[in-house]
Amino acid sequence: MADPWQECMDYAVTLAGQAGEVVREALKNEMNIMVKSSPADLVTATDQKVEKMLITSIKEKYPSHSFIGEESVAAGEKSILTDNPTWIIDPIDGTTNFVHGFPFVAVSIGFVVNKKMEFGIVYSCLEDKMYTGRKGKGAFCNGQKLQVSHQEDITKSLLVTELGSSRTPETVRIILSNIERLLCLPIHGIRGVGTAALNMCLVAAGAADAYYEMGIHCWDVAGAGIIVTEAGGVLLDVTGGPFDLMSRRVIASSNKTLAERIAKEIQIIPLQRDDED
């Protein structure tokens, strides 16, 4: 049987490339920066422009499909995931990087049907790296097949995480205490490039062994999640249970052994789900 979603994926790859052009062009100009949920949660006119471009283009071609977009949700739309084919879009993952010219900025497009990830695209605009993953077909970066590492020993692992955009002292305390606990196991190190999507792609590429974070949103992980699993990795909840796209937390790991060990070590931050009011 023909793959019903391949055409959607091909179209999304083209759109992600076009969105990357807009992002690169915008970096040459003065930008208008706005603040969302905290002084460190930033949005620019380019985020809004790219999301509008992506959703408008996809809606024209696939009018019956649903959408969850970071900037649409910020403007008051709900992020409710149904069984309908749904595009989950982060127009610029790494807005703070974008604002500062720090060179890790991604366009992320995830496509979910019956609440299951079908394909994901993460385009690293300044590196010109197009990461793609399609259910059952593998994960690639610029056409090269991706494969996770085989590192199961946490003491020999390189992890990726972020400090997040919350500036609430208690949340910051938990984030830093989790990092301290992991570093002192010890492990080889902790890195972070400032975007959830690219951190996950680094796990898919075998450059890092696992990524964990709490406080992310569905649009941060919907594109990269399937890239990780198609590269041979696993997605788990930070409790060690099954991954839930709307839960705002994830461990993306090269293997389950490492993911479960991370889950055992970290303290959980209480968060409101993406699909709660």
Curated annotation (Swiss-Prot):
Pfam families: Inositol_P (PF00459). One of its GO terms (molecular function) is inositol monophosphate 3-phosphatase activity. Its main location: cytoplasm. Disulfide bonds: none annotated. Mg(2+) 2 binds at residues 90, 93, 220. Activity with myo-inositol monophosphate and D-galactose 1-phosphate is inhibited by Li(+), Ca(2+) and Mn(2+), but also by Mg(2+) at concentrations above 3 mM. Transmembrane segments: none annotated. One of its GO terms (cellular component) is cytoplasm. Mg(2+) 1 binds at residues 70, 90, 92. One of its GO terms (biological process) is inositol metabolic process. Its cofactor is Mg(2+). Its EC number is 3.1.3.25, 3.1.3.94. Substrate binds at residues 70, 92-95, 194-196, 213, 220. Keywords: Cytoplasm, Hydrolase, Lithium, Magnesium, Metal-binding, Phosphoprotein. The keyword Magnesium applies. Belongs to the inositol monophosphatase superfamily. Homodimer. Phosphatase involved in the dephosphorylation of myo-inositol monophosphate to generate myo-inositol. Is also able to dephosphorylate scyllo-inositol-phosphate, myo-inositol 1,4-diphosphate, scyllo-inositol-1,3-diphosphate and scyllo-inositol-1,4-diphosphate. Also dephosphorylates in vitro other sugar-phosphates including D-galactose-1-phosphate, glucose-1-phosphate, glucose-6-phosphate, fructose-1-phosphate, beta-glycerophosphate and 2'-AMP. This is Inositol monophosphatase 1. The lineage of its organism: Eukaryota, Metazoa, Chordata, Craniata, Vertebrata.
